[in-house]
Amino acid sequence: MKIAHIIPGSGGSFYCGNCLRDSKYMKALQDLDQEVIKVPLYLPLFEDAHDLNEVPVFYGAVDIYLKQRFPVFRHMPAFVDRMLNSKSVLNLAAQNAGSTRAKGLEEMTVSMLLGEEGLQKGELERLVEWLRDEAKPDVVHLSNALLLGLARRIKQEMNIPVVCSLQDEDVWVDVMSDKHREEVWQIMEARGREVDAFISVSDFYAKEMKKRMHIRPDRLFINHIGVDTADYQVKPVQDKEPVIGFISRMCEENGLGVLVDAFLLLKEDEAYSPVKLKITGGKTNDDTAFIKQQKKKIASAGLEEQVLWVEEFENPSRQNFFDTVALLTVPVLNGEAFGLYQLEALASGIPLVQPELGAFPEVVGLSEGGVTYHPNSPKKLAKAWKSIILDKEKLTELSVKGLEGVKTHFDIHKQSEKLVEIYKKVAVKA
């Protein structure tokens, strides 16, 4: 089977779990003798293996933004489009968060969801023509429901099944103004009827999106994210220094402020003087001021030497990060549909301390490799850390259980086999 996986790129300026999810699935599907084509949208992809084989970036972020905002750009010569879609321009755009956050992009989100009725209809036709004439897939897999505007024309032109993953669309949509938020959910529900199946990354998020988009149960599948534990090395957690790790985009929404405040509370107790904090995951320009505030708080507490900020987050630096932390916490303010960093940590033998939000309890519960706390406050997080971070026996127990839990419930090869079965089911129905 030949699968075209359409994936929005983040540009590589921060740890993008959704991008890594798609990249890992592509490799696992190829191991199952499936032919997979990764088709990037908006920005270049963040992944460990840069193997796009010169597939062009469709819907270049700079190009479509200018055409959306300034009508004059809709009539520019082709060489201008090529320049705006060059890798150097797109990588520069990725450093500026306007392309990776919803505020200010509401109208473009609506236009993208409208597909052939939106302002990006030219880009849509270019993508469809390339899929039809060059890629020639048997099935198209959309990375998230914000891409549902592509489905109608793909099916009209190619008469093949289209499936759509569900992960964190609410994070993008719910920060919009009331008017745009309601409009986007309505269009997503309507356009969602045009795909053959939805695939949620967690039970939690399946229930959430079933309610929001009124998805029929027979069209909704659950396929947890997976990792290959062979890709990670396990350093015995009992031999590590007591270092708490954070790996995600370093921003307010991902709980960086909660993390720092909890660490300051923890360090008020002299019993935890050996504990350090290690932070990585990248950022965009939008995050700079907030990060500066956190560093100022740390400096005011005299803890600059206890907190290590690591700029590089792609492999091998990411593995080095996992080699040196004994515990992982990413206290996302409103939770997440999944959170791939949890599996990367567990596969490296690192226990989790996560808030009881989103799918975090689902991952912790199935893996048995961590603890959760509630509410998501600095005080509760510091208390949860205290119950584990200096307890070598407890850390070791959670480390062993977590690694086994990943192998049992979140193995990328098993999950990929399930994904192929979903493709086969929709292909028969289509």
Question: Where are the predicted features?
Answer:
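A conserved catalytic-core segment of Leloir-type glycosyltransferases
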Residues: 38-126
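Carbohydrate-associated surface elements
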Residues: 204, 226
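Conserved donor-binding/catalytic core segment of Leloir-type glycosyltransferases
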Residues: 237-254, 260-264, 278
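Glycosyltransferase donor-sugar binding loop
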Residues: 276-295
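Nucleotide-activated donor-binding/catalytic signature segment of Leloir-type glycosyltransferases, i.e.
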Residues: 291-313
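Acidic donor-binding loop of glycosyltransferase active sites
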Residues: 323-337, 350
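Conserved acidic donor-binding segment of nucleotide-sugar-dependent glycosyltransferases
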Residues: 366-378, 387-392
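A short, well-ordered alpha-helix in the C-terminal region of glycosyltransferases
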Residues: 380, 387, 394-409, 415-421, ...
